[in-house]
Curated annotation (Swiss-Prot):
The gene is cysI. Belongs to the nitrite and sulfite reductase 4Fe-4S domain family. It holds the Pfam family NIR_SIR_ferr. Alpha(8)-beta(8). The alpha component is a flavoprotein, the beta component is a hemoprotein. The keyword Methyltransferase does not apply. This is Sulfite reductase [NADPH] hemoprotein beta-component.
Amino acid sequence: MSEQKLALNEYLKTDSDYLRGTIKEGLDSAVTGSFSDGDQQLIKFHGFYQQDDRDLRNERKEQKLEPLYSFMLRARVPGGICSPQQWLGVDKIASTLTSSNSIRLTTRQTFQYHGIPKRNLKTIIQDLDREALDSIAACGDVNRNVMCNPNPVESKLHEQAYAVAKQLSDHLLPHTRAYAEIWLDEEKLLSTEDETVEPVYGKTYLPRKFKMAVAVPPDNDVDVYTNDLGFIAVAENGELVGFNLTAGGGMGSTHGEVETFPRLADDFGFIKTEDVMKFAEAVMTVQRDWGNRVNRKRSRLKYTIVDHGYEKFKAEVELRAGVKFEPKRDVVIGDRGDRYGWVEGVDGKWHLTLFIESGRIKDLPGQTLQTGLREIAKIHKGDFRMTSNQNMIIAGVAAEDKATIEGLARKHGLLGQVLTQTRGHSIACVALPTCPLAMAEAERYFPEFIDHIDALQAKHGISEQAIVVRMTGCPNGCARPFAAEIGLVGKAPGRYNLYLGASFEGTRLNKMHRENIQEAEILAELDTLFGRYAVERDAGETFGNFTVRVGVVKAVIDAAKDFHG
């Protein structure tokens, strides 16, 4: 591979002085609202992407103006937990320093801001820092935000799992001081030897993004098998004893390029809790050294495992960790949804899960979600937990405070919505107008689409059945559409590829059923299938399993061979 020309990003990273580039100079320039092409790649490591309003792109071009550039900043919040005080700071930033005046909960248990002008970036990062929050490594070719099941029922086990997720996040952060120097005005230290700057990542970091999740069975809301590296908690007598390790998952693909495909992770075996950091670092460094740095479309860990082989990869990980895998332990992987409403934990505290459609927290007529969460944060004594289904848990509520919290939630439209089983299990990415990769709508259209799905389920008498439905504006897969029982992936404005056949639990991918079709065709197809499902399903059979059993689509067993075939 050394004889081949590397991907451009590899040269950018090498020459960036550990992610500094010319970001500071670009930030100081008032000539444009943009950064240079090279710095646009480097700023991802600092937690944000350059975007523009695509709804206004043609109009501004006609006016001979540059695109209306803005930035999306994503925070690093391992496990999705923040304090009410932190949330008040997060809310204030959204209300005063962004044009969207909203907060977007993501599918990886954090939040992001849209519509940030370049001049406000530094202020926002400094304001986040005052709340002990940051955006380091929220994007870029590094370990991203580490997910962990909120699981507020098993509080003790959750806290143990969360501690591991937090440790993973902290241990695998980049060591460069570029973030602190550029955004927090820290003085630059004298240059040191390369290997001491980034002992794990090295000068070129990873070949591509790297995603981790910690799952606490039976819940699988973190979609553990869709991650590069997963840790499935194993408990004995309610105490965490270790994890089943999974590796090689990832959703992204490219339309029309069969060498790219989504993939679910492989099971590698059981590891003890004290060995988690050894194995995490081992998997990451194998990917660092073996991953494809020539073709970024084939650079995720899933392709490294496919190209080198499972056994070879496993042996190298064991060698670097200095520990061998034990046989995986039996665990039950179940529901990927959230528990809406009040749930009592084993510690006697109560937890209120609020449905936030597509994760968008914004004040609208009759539904003042942002104000509601702000008012709750002012009085709440527990914490806020963001879920990977883009929802919010008001966690750790004392019994005597329940009525007050619930009253505020109802007053501001955070409770009381008509929520079907399917809507509660469905998510969408942002897509248009801000995402530069989007080929079709997702977040703005998704609520209307789910209305149609709800109506079809009611028509056929299957409203009680939860169906996992996900929509993205492109095949990069941010809302994990290839692990949905019904997946819609944007192909062109108003057109989507329809995927069917994933398992309800997230242990099998779906497969394309129809390509490049419009809403009417999608709904007609689902109308027919829902009719069959209502009559022909076995007792307890989920929709995804049904579509495979009756031959609507073939089961994807080996994604490298089956997904496109």
